C-alpha cells in the first residue's frame, strides 16, 4: 500500500511541474501585444543580447528587480543589449500602470492568460520574476542570474 501511495505522489508531482527550457536551447518564439496593441516578436531582436523577463505588476520581487534591469538596460542598450519584458498580469490596466510607475522604457508585451498562457508554459515559468538571457543568435545562455552575474555575462556576450 505504501509503495502505491508513493507512486501516486510522484506521478502527481511530475504532472504538476512544468518543463522549463534549458540553457543552450534556442529560445521559443514569443509573439504578443505590446503597449500599443501591436504584436511584437521576440525574434525581431535577433542579433542582440536579450534579457527575457517574466514579471507581473502584483509581484513584489518583480517590481523590486526592475530598477536593476533598467540600470543594465540604460548602460548597455547602445551596445546591442535589449530587454523583452513579458507581463503575466490578468488586467492590462494594472500592467500599463506599473510600466508608468516604474518608468520602464524597454520592450514590454502582455499575456493576459497569466500563469496558464502558452508563453509561460512554453518557458516553464512557475515562479516570477523569471529571467532568461539570450545570445545574439537567440540561444538561451543563462537563467535567473543575480544582478552581478547577469552584468558580467552581458559584458562577455557583447564583446
Report residues per predicted region.
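Bacterial Sec-dependent N-terminal signal peptides
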Residues: 1-23
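N-terminal "domain-start" segment that seeds a small globular fold
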Residues: 17-44
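Short loop/turn microsegments at loop-to-beta-strand junctions
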Residues: 27-28, 50, 128-129
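Short active-site neighborhood of thiol/selenol oxidoreductases, capturing the structured segment around
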Residues: 42-59
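Short beta-strand segments
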Residues: 53, 83-87, 109
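Structural microenvironment flanking redox-active thiols in thiol-disulfide oxidoreductases
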Residues: 64-102, 115-120
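Short, internal strand/loop/helix patches
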Residues: 96-132, 136-137
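Thiol-/selenol-based redox modules, centered on thioredoxin-like
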Residues: 130-159
